[in-house]
Amino acid sequence: MASPSSFTYCCPPSSSPIWSEPLYSLRPEHARERLQDDSVETVTSIEQAKVEEKIQEVFSSYKFNHLVPRLVLQREKHFHYLKRGLRQLTDAYECLDASRPWLCYWILHSLELLDEPIPQMVATDVCQFLELCQSPEGGFGGGPGQYPHLAPTYAAVNALCIIGTEEAYDVINREKLLQYLYSLKQPDGSFLMHDGGEVDVRSAYCAASVASLTNIITPDLFEGTAEWIARCQNWEGGIGGVPGMEAHGGYTFCGLAALVILKKERSLNLKSLLQWVTSRQMRFEGGFQGRCNKLVDGCYSFWQAGLLPLLHRALHAQGDPALSMSRWMFHQQALQEYILMCCQCPTGGLLDKPGKSRDFYHTCYCLSGLSIAQHFGSGAMLHDVVLGVPENALQPTHPVYNIGPDKVIQATMHFLQKPVPGFEEHEDEASAEPATD
């Protein structure tokens, strides 16, 4: 095992000027955005008012302490929090014993966004650990010796692609992984999360993500999957876990991202979906809620905001003339303010909302959402909107896979050099059969 000192904090340069525009949340009229319950209190409205009060305290502290121009991403503190997490966890994480590949992914992706390199010895240790989590049946379990499950399989493949070395790629048993995906496929096009487990949109996304990254998609593996996902879109415009259920940010992201991978985005009512997701950004807090009438949560900075690049791409492909060519269809500045002011733990790590504890899950998805809010487009269309000091800028993340775009390209190029397991061999056998009259 590598010692923690094998990590070296890389402090970015600090020569650029600070952001000088006024903050959205500190406008004199911003209080008008608070909840108006028309004197009819409900459990929901009471909880919303409590959250708004805590967030107002945070906004006020910035205003009265003259810290307005000093919105700073506490990079070094987050880096040290993440570095420790790869080596040692407190007993509070005992409940995540079946999610250990997720911890690897959340931490590695957070470091990737912060542009912190992974030392070779640490990368090797992660590869060896994830190899222990791989099941002989295919796929990865939540820990060594545990049953395989699509969620930790997704996390493990993403973590290995972030490392991006031959050693990491070689951990993945593609033949067994394909067999495992087939074993979970259902006649209606959906996938089980694990043998004997539940079906929902997450499993379709996890399957599509790992299959596309590792080049194991066969002609019939996702037959009927796009149609099943489309049936999960409900009257609200968002996507539920299964057909007929309430729209939810996490399920909606999984559904649309899976359809992007399968090139079937048009299976959805995209305008209805756009209306639903843009309505989930909270007017007062600036962050996103996961469902209608729920509270703001930092993790939806990615699950909801990450939908907007996917929708932008899909609507652009349809020739929508109303699309901006310089910004996403949500308030990017307001989201950055919420994350930077309300979601940073003073000792490192990020959190759901003021008053909550930090964890690696929220650290990963708050940083991922911050990256989405900072970067529009790519190449000639790139337009950055970085709030606060210039050093707040994060590395971009791929809106479909939520790992670095360069890591997606590197992994797909690597695995495209390998045949789809069992597929080319089957084609060769078919072509070798003698012709019959």
Curated annotation (Swiss-Prot):
GO molecular function, one term: protein farnesyltransferase activity
Binding site for (2E,6E)-farnesyl diphosphate: 248-251, 291-294, 300-303
SUPFAM superfamilies: Terpenoid cyclases/Protein prenyltransferases
Key word Metal-binding present: yes
Keywords: Lipid metabolism, Metal-binding, Phosphoprotein, Prenyltransferase, Repeat, Transferase, Zinc
Top-tier EC class: transferase
Location of Phosphothreonine modifications: 436
Cofactor binding summary note: Binds 1 zinc ion per subunit.
Ranges for the PFTB repeats: 123-164, 174-215, 222-263, 270-312, 332-374
Enzyme Commission number(s): 2.5.1.58
GO cellular component: protein farnesyltransferase complex
Binding site for Zn(2+): 297, 299, 362
Pfam families, alphabetized: Prenyltrans
UniProt cross-references to CDD domains, sorted A to Z: FTase
Cofactor(s) demanded: Zn(2+)
Tree of life domain: Eukaryota
Gene3D superfamilies assigned to the protein according to its UniProt record, in alphabetical order: 1.50.10.20
The keyword Glycoprotein is annotated on this UniProt entry: no
Biological role: Essential subunit of the farnesyltransferase complex. Catalyzes the transfer of a farnesyl moiety from farnesyl diphosphate to a cysteine at the fourth position from the C-terminus of several proteins having the C-terminal sequence Cys-aliphatic-aliphatic-X.
PANTHER family: GERANYLGERANYL TRANSFERASE TYPE BETA SUBUNIT, PROTEIN FARNESYLTRANSFERASE SUBUNIT BETA
Assembly: Heterodimer of FNTA and FNTB.
Membership in a protein family: Belongs to the protein prenyltransferase subunit beta family.
Protein name, entry field: Protein farnesyltransferase subunit beta
Species assigned in the record: Bos taurus (Bovine)
Underlying gene: FNTB
